[in-house]
Amino acid sequence: MNFLKLKNIILKLENIIIFNKETLKNKNNSSYIFRLSKIKFLLTVCLIPIFIFLLKKKMNKIKIYKNNYVSNNTFNYLKDDNEFLKKLKIILKEEELFENELMSKHTTFRIGGPAKYFVKPKTIKQIKKIINLCNEYNLKYFVLGNGSNLLVSDIGYLGVIIQIKGDNFSNLKVIKDDENNYTILVGAGMPMRALSIESCLLSLTGLEDVVDIPGTIGGGIIMNVSFRGTGLSKSLIKVKVITPEGKIKELSKKECGLYHRGSKLKDMKYIVVEAVFKLKKGDQMIIQKTMTDNTKNRYKKQPMYFGSAGCFFIWNHTENGSLYKKYKESNLVSYRVGNIMIYTYNISFIVNLGKGTASEVIEIVEYITKIMKEKYNIEMKREVIVIGTINGIDYF
């Protein structure tokens, strides 16, 4: 039994035994009220020890996780923390460094506990130094763009979150090759929507389909995002990356190893800092119409008012058939745990109805995975990246 189930039981019991004032006024029998109080007292006595037991169990899991984290990463929080922070403050200005920053503020899922360190570097040089520092202390790090396609643990992230976003990583340079062809150099922190609109204003075609994909250029390339079959990869020429060793490399599109909903860049943990695209001159009215149609389609099918991380699973319709049909047969449409639900109007999405948790998301994900394997022998592969420890499992 988890906290959510226990909470639901308590709420149901309260609904049964607790009456409003008007109801109590109408009950003149004092013995009836006494029996009601006695039942409530007995239930409380029984349930409180169970709640305390589960709480202790959960706290032990967190302690075990922290101990494992220190031993596996050789980062001693008592000894190395102050020293690491001092060196981090040399690299970054005060407004670029945050401690215990809530990740729910930085993800489209609106879920996530505090990151030990949250940094917003403004130069490639700073990023390199931060990575080298993390390597020196063997402290894990994760690179964040717009926070889409990401689920962060409720207890947070015991490492460094590096956000590549904002004006310093949104530079745009347009080079005219000839009358019909243009080269676009863009920073990895520019939102895909912004680049799509800029291209339209210049009457350049090739990036219409990313107009309403949340996320930055860097994240979009690494995850190889697309809408209706096309995305950034169609016009991509090359990228500039920082390797896990802190070195800068230039890679061609082929070297990026792009595949459906992923890339070699993701597998190798490369950080994209710049990208080069080739776009063609087009009719601005046609480009604008395509973008408008894309926006209408996305608003019809996708949860615009709930927190989500986009499509949660990678699904091959050609190989596996209709996902909706399988969900319908398995009673998974609108399946809900707490404040997390499979979106009714597009079952590819798992949405946060308000105060959802990462634990609730994983509970749904594990249930879907189990059902799809047992009933259809299909291995469900996550598209969304999960970081931190959830329900005792360390994801990243």
What kind of feature is each model-predicted range?
Residues 10-20, 34-60:
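Terminal signal-anchor or tail-anchor transmembrane helices
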Residues 53-144:
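N-terminal, positively charged, Ser/Thr/Ala/Gly-biased leader segments
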Residues 97-99, 142-145, 152, 186-188, ...:
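General beta-strand structural signal in soluble alpha/beta enzymes
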Residues 98, 146, 150, 242-366, ...:
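Phosphate/pyrophosphate- and phosphate-bearing ligand-binding catalytic cores of soluble enzymes
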Residues 109-112, 135-136, 143-144, 151-155, ...:
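Solvent-exposed alpha-helices and their adjacent loops that cap or buttress functional pockets
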Residues 112, 118-124, 151-170, 222-253, ...:
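Structural signature of FAD isoalloxazine-binding scaffolds in flavoprotein oxidoreductases
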Residues 163, 169, 177-212:
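A generic, well-ordered mixed alpha/beta core segment in the N-terminal half of proteins
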Residues 193-237, 243, 308:
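A gly/ser-rich beta-alpha-beta helix-loop segment of oxidoreductase catalytic cores
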